[in-house]
Amino acid sequence: MDAVTVNNFFLIGAVLVGMSILVSSLSSRLGIPILVIFLAVGMIAGNDGVGGIVFDNYPMAYLVGNLALAVILLDGGLRTRVSSFRVALWPALSLATLGVLVTTGLTGIAAAWLFDLHWMEGLLIGAIVGSTDAAAVFSLLGGKGLNERVTATLEIESGSNDPMAVFLTVTLIEMLASGQTGLSWGFALHLVQQFGLGALLGLGGGWLLLQLINRMHLAGGLYPLLVISGGLLVFALANAVGGSGILAIYLCGLLLGNRPIRSRHGILHMLDGMAWLAQIGMFLVLGLLVTPHDLWPIALPALALALWMILVARPLSVLIGLIPFRAFHDREKAFIAWVGLRGAVPIILAVFPLMAGLPNAQLFFNVAFFIVLVSLLVQGTSLPWAARLLRVVVPPDPAPISRAGLEIHPTSEWELFVYHLNKEKWCIGAALRELKMPGGTRIAALFRGTELLHPSGSTILEADDILCVIGHEHDLPALGKLFSQAPDRGLGARFFGDFVLEGDAQLSAVASLYGLKLDGIDGEQALGRFIAHEIGGEAVIGDQVEWNGLTWTVAALEGNRIRKVGVKFPEGRPGPGLFL
């Protein structure tokens, strides 16, 4: 490779990445998932597009795809709160195993019939597109304000279902290549090995990496690089010994993100940029890899298969996978079924048959690519609409306009929160001493216009003041009630109900106040405890229960305890305006 070729490579790469970033603003304007934009840029620059770039290096695409996916999963694990496992671990694992099997089987049967393939080749297509994609899920669910049970289930599922899809794909390729037509006990053993070794190496490697980071004294910019290199080492080791590298690096990130770690905010800041670069690079390469004119001959059967998977296979897999978990409402199940987003993973898995030289391998790749495109365009584009229709959106928590980490000591979790006080805030005109600040928080600075003031207890807050507060992440809900942009009160009233009651209120008192019948229910118990029992599992904000013709909504939690409950009356039946 001469100097001119290298320079052209840099030139083309920079132009494509830059174009992807610049046109990404179209995503929100057009309501199209940003991943589709990146994929489209690659296709436009490819063989059939205006760029005319010929790229058919499948091993290179496999390398780029795996590297990018590893970085995205590491970043996703770092940002996943382990508290979300409280409500979603077992349901997500059920969907990641049983759900993938059901989706693979149903999609495989349809694929074999639509494309006139052997049943094992049909199952191979089903396995390739059987898992939801972490990159797509993390990208499209971020900032949508979905309730915790739905968000956590989808994110954990997408981070843990790839091992099953990879295992099924590799096993079916080996069987097709060797002419084998039956399954053996080694099938189940290999699956246990994938999950077991992946989990062991992910958690073990994450713990060792955590100890190393907290004991090393390095330049600040080197800690994120150490996390990335350590995560990739865990990913590669797990793959080398027969485990799931994808699961391993996700769990490695999960452990690092939920423990005190040196330079936390620097690590998260850099990983955010690296994850974006990984998504752009991966979808650009996959867009370059496909030849659009090859998709037209299979468009109709591939569209039928995509719709079968979206409307039949995925909903049935969710319905079966969530049978043991009664805490899920039908509307939550429906939303989870709809958000079975496919992304880069199926396209990467579709490269496996090409590298193995299987007959019909190009067909498998084209079908997988078409299904991913339909999934992102149909499911991804309609996600906000589906969330509102199925009522899984909860009013957003108020948030500071910016936040930054304070590295006071190696594993410091102190942060600086910045709040803008507009004229609608109730605290305007109040003295600082009148504010009920959460314990352990301090107002560090106050800006008025361009002037820095020294805040004291007698300082009167004015409109457009900027407050800088030092605290911890768990202080954000309380601080939000004081300073942050006020949430839409109309939205809150529509969602949580006409009145909000204390969860500790005695059920008999609530029944007496609203004229409700207990019908043998223990009236001495707290309202929150009764609602939790009716939900049937771990409660999340936004959970709803119908009782005595009224809608009761979980409005606030304190740990696992329901702290506040909203009550909504039928139209035309107002209730007493009393807060218990």
From Swiss-Prot:
One of the GO BP terms on file: intracellular potassium ion homeostasis
Transmembrane spans: 3-23, 34-54, 58-78, 95-115, 122-142, 163-183, 189-209, 218-238, 241-261, 270-290, 303-323, 335-355, 363-383
Gene3D superfamilies in the cross-refs: 1.20.1530.20, 3.30.465.10, Regulator of K+ conductance, C-terminal domain
HAMAP family registered for this protein in UniProt: NhaP2 (MF_01075)
Protein known as: K(+)/H(+) antiporter NhaP2
Membrane topology annotation: Multi-pass membrane protein
Pfam families documented for this protein: CorC_HlyC, Na_H_Exchanger, TrkA_C
Compartment annotation: Cell inner membrane
Primary location recorded for the protein, binned into one broad class: membrane
Gene: nhaP2
Residue ranges constituting the RCK C-terminal domain according to the UniProt record: 403-485
GO molecular function, one term: flavin adenine dinucleotide binding
